[in-house]
């Protein structure tokens, strides 16, 4: 197989969107969202076997500290996976080898990372990639609504019923004010742990701007009996997979259990639109009460030179330290204000 870069102006997005293994994270609008928020350039490449096009690759390139990187996806992008779209019978490990050659020789990258929901761990190991994983949970939406609800533990089902009896209602959002409301609630969630959100308000606004018009994202609010917005959530989806991207609520209203009702609404929404999998957006044992099962997607990384991989690991540690410091600083400021 060979990878050939496709010029942005001639990409046939409708053709790409017809692939059975296509996810929302490979769509044109999602790439535009990542490009805008990460100062990155979208890359779409044909995968050819002889004269036949057997698939496509989607990702982005960016440069940090003089190092050019190919990401599909990359840590910090709030995008769990991208990868390939291939016709039945095409082999992902062979496509990955072709992509690596393109990354080094044509794109002149020094580092690359690829995560694909259809990868097997062996696909990367055989080519010398360092292997980690995007670890999450999944709910099978092919089950009936009754089976999904009965699969939750009894306490979770009681929370859903309590929210309904307390007058909590879920509404779909389509207005610009949604991003601000969601982010205020998100800050409250992180403040509980003396942290600050890992992304800023502008990222949420960019996501809503690019994705809301497509119909491939569900934005929801939970309102209490008095009409106050007490919780919200962001749930992109396309083809077979929907994703829990973000959910936030005010601590003062969590006794009404709006979050459980939101997830129950979201699973039914995407199920009714033919989606087969609800991905719970990463780790968190609290998610197990919904009856979901653990699932991991291989994440492959490789650097052309060893020093680059060390830079990547150190950058990740620096980001984690920054988050803890910013959370401490915010807590200190709040305490000073109250005093």
Q: What would you call each of these model-derived segments?
A:
Residues 5-6, 11-20, 98-106, 270, ...:
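Alpha-helix C-terminal capping segments
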Residues 57, 61, 123-147, 273-339:
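Active-site/acyl-donor-binding loops of N-acyltransferases
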Residues 75-117:
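A gly/proline- and charged-residue-enriched helix-loop-helix capping module
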Residues 42, 107-111, 275:
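A general structural motif
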Residues 60-81, 310:
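Conserved acyl-donor/pantetheine-binding loop and adjacent beta-alpha core of acyl/acetyltransferases
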Residues 1-50, 54-67, 116-255:
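A conserved beta-strand-loop-helix scaffold within acyl/acetyltransferase catalytic domains
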Residues 113, 171, 276-279:
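Short catalytic-loop micro-motif centered on adjacent basic/acidic residues
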Residues 46-48, 56-57, 79, 91-101, ...:
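Aromatic (often tryptophan-rich) hydrophobic motifs at membrane interfaces
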